[in-house]
Amino acid sequence: MSAQRLALLTPHRVAASDVDALLPAIEAACAAGDVAAVILRLAPADERALTALVKRVAPAVQAHEAALVVACPGFAGDLVSVATRGGADGVHVDKPAGLKDLRERLREGRILGTGGFETRHAAMDAGEGGADYLMFGGLYPDGEAPDAEGVRARAAWWAEIFETPCIAVACAAEEIPGHAATGAEFVGLESALWLADPAGVARAQEALGGAA
């Protein structure tokens, strides 16, 4: 397996008023380790406002050769349009009903990621629907963390059988080595692990090396 990389998850419901504080934290975190992607979890707003927000964040992420992937749970508008017009590299959707349609619309190499699976069958459907990666774990919008052991079990099952890459998301630092040991191509870091202190990314990078 090629070297594992990191994915950073922002807090849920990022709004335009959060961006000034978020940008320097993202840049410092991306510089501190081998970050493949930042998943930007936006608060629902109108498409024009969301597009403007994405335009502000995308250059900061892409300057570090990382991909910006946009998520917006509860948004009823056109997330693909927001991502493409904002210059993002892709979109992330949970429990998608129209994954194949999204896949057809996301062209020019843009990324389609998905998560929020309640069953293995749902995960397999997502893989067959054209997702570029599957994400296991991550804080729920209410701030509750999933069972870390369950996240590891699902990620290990997926990584062993399927070719589509997966992200195993750590909500606490002590989860990182175990998540890395699943064989997942990426280990995700919740914002508590990097937002206030970019050194958390460097420590996570060291943990990946120890799990290899």
Task: Label the model's feature ranges.
Residues 102:
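Conserved active-site neighborhood of the chymotrypsin/trypsin-like protease fold
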Residues 1-92, 106-132, 146-149, 157, ...:
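Conserved N-terminal beta1-alpha1 strand-loop-helix module at the mouth
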Residues 187-189:
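Acidic, Mg2+-coordinating phosphoryl-transfer loop and its flanking beta/alpha structural elements
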